[in-house]
Amino acid sequence: MKKLLLIATTSATILSSSISFADDMGNEWYLRVDAGAAMFNKEQDKATSVKLKSNTTVPVDLGIGYYIFENFRADLTLGTIIGGKLKASGSATHAPFTGTNVSVSHKPTITRLLINGYVDLTNFDLFDVFAGAGVGPALVKEKITYNGITGLSSNTKNRTNISYRLTLGTSAQIADGVKAELAYSWIYDGRTKSKNVIYQGTSVLTGGMRYQSHNLTAGIRFDI
């Protein structure tokens, strides 16, 4: 938690410096909200070696930012996901569960605070194309469920990771001071904590799941 607060403070300081510069330039600042659909990369469960697939999850971000230059802006966003899971059913291939039919589910809770920068690549009359990148702390934990293996299900505690985001999108002005966005982002949130669970006298390693996702989002920016 201390690490999260330290990184958050650093991110806020960097954004504050950008804001001060933007104020000197007489530029505006904005609020933003984004939501859409996302899917995690395929992963493998450590305890059973069952290969997991993602359902469709809903990413949500709220943020505040400034226009630093005419074609460059920066913002600070707080984001999370709703309803995401990695899951699958199959036959375990990892001892001591080899041959056991099991249904595995990893349900993550992810909260990230990112400082982002965006550059407009082109400026057309009706829309702009932009690219961006972001970095910041993410709190990641998960609930792990095994149906078919009694006593193995568990929860991991929060782990603070460094999260990264790469973005490519387009924006268009829809009203005075209001822009709509459509963007694709790849986000890496790191791994959850690993946990040893005692199963019938044997220590079994669970958790340690890696979360990276492909996101398609729509958003609104309001000048304030």
Swiss-Prot record:
User: Where on the tree of life does the source sit, at the highest rank?
Assistant: Bacteria
One Pfam family here: OmpA_membrane
Q: Does the keyword Protease apply?
A: no
**What are the disulfide bonds?**
none
Q: Which residues form the signal peptide?
A: 1-22
SUPFAM superfamilies in the record:
OMPA-like (SSF56925)
Keywords, alphabetical:
Signal
GO terms under cellular component:
cell outer membrane
Q: Which InterPro entries match?
A: OMP/PagP_b-brl, OmpA-like_TM_dom
Q: What is this protein called?
A: Putative adhesin A1C_06425
Q: Tell me which species this is from.
A: Rickettsia akari (strain Hartford)
